[in-house]
Amino acid sequence: MACHCFPVFPNDDEPQSPESECISCDAELDFQLDETCELPGELTVAIGEGPDDFLPLADGEQPEFYAGFQGGGHSFFSVQVGNVELSRYDRLEVVVDAYYPEECPDDGTHCGPSYGRRVVVLDGEPWTLVDGVVQEHGILMQLEGQTVAQVTVRDPCGRVGWAQHRW
């Protein structure tokens, strides 16, 4: 899998970034819908934090903030996806977005349009399988102030799941 890595260098005033050569990784892989695939149910999606693991976030909880060397800031998100059929397919399409609260209605509906990055991921690193649920950690996002993070996941069978986290 090909990766584009984005190192983060914290300053001494903020928590230190975990030691890692590659903190975020975008896969350069094709994603195609399989018109013959029909699976019941939806994908379940949860947003957490963590550069090395999935750590759930409580409602309204802000993820840990790491200061960048040029004065910006970053947080590490993690994603958990359930109801995945790894026996049927080996990749997912994941879109990670961040919005200002005024750009996203507070009524539980999907925000849009998408400004995030499209990530197509195979199973295996950086994804892990934990108790039947697929997890990815170390998704680097540049955030400042109040934010709505949104993750939308689609499998090759066309099933979609999404989650939002506000703070």
Tell what function each PLM region has:
Residues 1-167:
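Signals and flexible motifs at protein termini associated with secretion
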